[in-house]
Amino acid sequence: MKKQRVVVKIGSSSLADSHGGISTEQLSDHVAALARLKEDGHEVVLITSGAVAAGFSALGYPSRPVTIKGKQAAAAVGQSLLMQAYTEEFRKYGIVTAQLLLTRSDFSRKEQYSNAYATLGELLNRSALPIINENDSISLEELTFGDNDMLSALVSGLVSADMLMIFTDVNGLYDKNPQKNADAKKYYFLPEVTEEISSLAGDAGSKLGTGGMKSKIDAAKTALSLGVSVFIGTGRGQEKFVDVLKGKGDGTYVGNAPQKEMKMNKQWIALHSLVSGQIEVDAGAATAIIQHGKSLLPAGVTNVLGFFQVGEVVEVVTQQGRVIGKGQCTYSAEELRDVKGMQSQDIQVRGERHSYEVIHRDHWVSL
């Protein structure tokens, strides 16, 4: 089997004991299976939940806290305990681990996003095993990923993974809740995440079973858009992750056909950047951008909405108001208002400008 880059997401339900804390037996089982992947020459990134579960009892909570301050306090204590447990287990296999704690703002800020990309690349080149969790102890509720499922999808795209494995306590996706319906049909393979599949998931306590299944389907859809194949399921034993790569996993495979990966810069624009304004374009410019892959030139701009600076991300809309994409603008809003509708040869050179493109195609994503 050829060397692959794999992101494995392990949720709290796959780590917890009967009291809601971390099961050392479960953790050891996961580490042994991850070590087998490394032994076979694969590159591995681990996305792990479990900080709250690892820390709540040490703070005297009788059960997992439900308040934000309680969860964040438990995560602050539990993250170091969780990382210590992983490090000690991986040391038995001679594997060096590295900890990365990420927040949503690390993805929305271009420089931090690029730094995360460079750091992960260097760690993998050095044969280390990055262990990533959301920085739950400081994350603002409105700025979180929502869960580690989406974090795992975004990381899998960032590192250009071949596969994302989302491990949970349910062995795949079903058309009904298998715990309540004996005739529930399991999906062994889905070529894509359709609206029908998304609607089956619904919200917590919906048709597909556990409350976390919707987030897993949303994560799968995001990963697929970034060119990463997905597995959602469960398993035990040292061979469980290797079996997934061999097509023998106990779960559902989603979109395992080869797809074109999205470059790091375009991932940031598409999924993480904050939009600072809008540019309205005529029909000819819209066709040139979408159908022919051209850059946006000032001649095609009909209106500029908002206030933005050079390098900030803007939406591009048609004259009917339909959003067709977004990209990094090489003009400020003030500059663009001065030159909109003008031919490139008629625009006076401003400062050190070497290009007249409003948005270069390398810094554009269609929506």
From Swiss-Prot:
List, alphabetically, the GO terms of the cellular component aspect. Answer: cytosol
Q: Where does substrate bind?
A: S49, D136, N148
Cite the binding residues for ATP.
K9, T168, D169, T210, G211, G212, M213, K214, S215, K216
Alphabetical UniProt keywords: Amino-acid biosynthesis, ATP-binding, Cytoplasm, Kinase, Nucleotide-binding, Proline biosynthesis, Transferase
- E.C. number(s) listed in UniProt: 2.7.2.11
GO BP terms: L-proline biosynthetic process
- Which reactions are catalysed by this chain? L-glutamate + ATP = L-glutamyl 5-phosphate + ADP
Q: Which GO terms describe its molecular function?
A: ATP binding; glutamate 5-kinase activity; RNA binding
Q: In which pathway does it act?
A: Amino-acid biosynthesis; L-proline biosynthesis; L-glutamate 5-semialdehyde from L-glutamate: step 1/2
Q: Where in the cell is it found?
A: Cytoplasm
Q: What is its main location?
A: cytoplasm
Q: Where is the signal peptide?
A: none
Q: Which InterPro entries match?
A: AceGlu_kinase-like_sf, Asp/Glu/Uridylate_kinase, G5K_ProB, Glu/AcGlu_kinase, Glu_5kinase, Glu_5kinase/COase_Synthase, Glutamate_5-kinase_CS, PUA
Q: Which residues form the PUA domain?
A: 276-350
Hey, which family's this protein in?
Belongs to the glutamate 5-kinase family.
Function, in words: Catalyzes the transfer of a phosphate group to glutamate to form L-glutamate 5-phosphate.
Protein name, please? Answer: Glutamate 5-kinase
